[in-house]
């Protein structure tokens, strides 16, 4: 997504032609992808107060803080966008995960056992069949417990939305694959009567295929730009009350 020239141009236009004060992003990683893309688009904005980006991997969070330190308006948040127990329950009961064979055109991680894959990712539990990427993820996740006083926060997406509720916002959802739609649902519920801009990444993935369908078919959303090939949609939700 971060190398898509069409999206970069759309974000530049969004920053230039609007008065967005706050950006909320889920999934910082190391800060060199979508976070830097957003920062570059809005660095000249006279209205932007802060870009708030959420990362649960402590190693990535620490690296991102260094990588993004030259942007004085970026606030790197260490923690999870969701309540952990609610996220695990969601993964275990999500119809699209339980019956993923009904969606052959949608990408899903570890189609042989997606529930355990996503639950392991959220819980930090490992077993002999766990993918090496997940093992590395959990190893990094556990680092701050011994080496730092900082502890992860939870429910950060809801908290940040409530903090900036009455302000002009861009919300960017690009978090863990198994709970992307949960993030969309929370955003949609909290902001159901408010105007805001929304960017979804991975619309051809389990993460956001349902949110994308809602955006295309519900009258309170209007699409600014999208790419089915690269899997993103930038849209506007109008005020409804």
Please identify what each model-predicted range represents.
Residues 1-199, 203-241:
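A short alpha-helical cap/connector motif
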